[in-house]
Amino acid sequence: MKRNLLISACVGFACSALPASAQISRLVHDADYAIEMSGTASSGDYAPFWLTSNRYGLSSVENNSGYVRGRVQRSTQADSTRLWRVGYGLDLAVPANYTSQAVVQQFYFDVDLRAFRLSVGAKERGESLKNAALSSGGLTQSVNARPVPQVRVELPDFWTIPGTHNWLAVKGHLAYGLFTDNRWQRETHPEGALYSANALYHSKAGFLRIGNEKKFPLSFIGGLEMSAQFGGEAWNVGRRTDDPTFDNSHVNMGHGFKSFWHAFIPGGSDAFDGAYLNNEGNQLGSWHFQLNWKGKDWNLKGYAEHFFEDHSQMFLEYGWKDMLWGVEATLPKNPFVSTVLYEHLRTTDQTGGLYHDATPELGIQISGLDNYYNHSFYGAWQHWGQAMGNPLLLSPVYNENGEIKFKHNRITAHHFGLSGQPLPELSYRLLFSHVRSLGSYEVPNIKPQFANYFMAQADYAPRHFHGLSFSAAVGSNGGSLIGNSFGGMLTLRKTGRF
């Protein structure tokens, strides 16, 4: 009798476990893998700029560097026929001559329900509206720095508002996360210089699309994107001129519910702000505008992004003089050129070089000196030394003395991108940027400094070796900004599916 009960229990357990094991098998068999090796060698003080920038932070400014990388990823699109769709990723790298000896580049879990997604972890997230392969990068968020681990709720793709007959659609996200570069900041900063640790991350965005390409070729996209650093600790903040009783050598910022709320709705104040209160944390963001004209077999896109650090530039109080303007053309299919892009970036105004808080003696508020990407407590809008926004505002990793700040945030730049696919197994892209830097209002250049950055990259995936691909790139730096250099990068990649 006991034996029969035991057999019945085992059979029942096996039957109940079968659906779970089948689910696990499905999740594993739909996953993709990649093994990658890459190496860079160059002359000069730094590796070529476009061999380093806009690579999700998995790069090095050193002359000679490389990595071995392995990743497993499953897209939620593998469950496209299901109500609940599951994706995940684990991406590890062992680098040489990088800012760390081992990199957890991606580690995330995605769950989709209808149009919504919950994403938990560190994930390489592309540009919201720009061509990540050719653009110089967004001003608030780009693909330049390592992913920040976060909990994120989003509409990843445009979702049509019911009842609008596909004429109105929205997309957006809300996220909270944690910066992971504590050790790098602690070891990099020069003695007595500002650095922070355990800073928290917030990001939100909302975009509206007006237009129905099936009915009319012209469409418009507009929206607001905002991010913040908050919480954590800061060292060597420095003495305030209006509060000489405390030197602010170490400051603890808030981590409570109010701090999370003030990151979402800017408000409150930072610890030891003194008599002149600012919003809590480092608040910044961008307004986005884009026009698209979709032809029969071609497409033309014009876009603009306005960056702001505070209310004076968020709205029209001082006028919008600092902008990123861009135009992108996707050409009819041909073996020479597929896409052409041009961008013009200006960040020289920053609402002027004067700041004054209103006082009883002089009741005029002048909200200048925005000092893009820099902050008095958090140092800089960066992660592991790389700009979270546009890399043409030279990242802190280039600072020879290790200071965690942007020293060249007043620039004008012209940027060009070109891509094509001459053969089914061969594609290429070209990037060129010309930058003129005035330094910053804090430390202006005595005379403008210039830089020219160039890169040519070819990717080859031989049809007879399924999943195997090669990438070769050459690049150069020229000018006085980061010096002259010339070098190349080779990458070997094997991909497949379990």
Model segments located where?
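Bacterial Sec-dependent N-terminal signal peptides
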Residues: 1-26, 496-498
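Transmembrane beta-barrel strands of outer-membrane/channel proteins
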Residues: 31-46, 86-94, 111, 118-124, ...
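Transmembrane beta-barrel outer-membrane domains
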Residues: 59-67, 98-104, 113, 144-148, ...
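Surface-exposed loop and membrane-interface regions of Gram-negative outer-membrane beta-barrel proteins
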Residues: 81-111, 125-144
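Exposed, low-structure sequence patches enriched in small/polar residues
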Residues: 218-227, 233-498
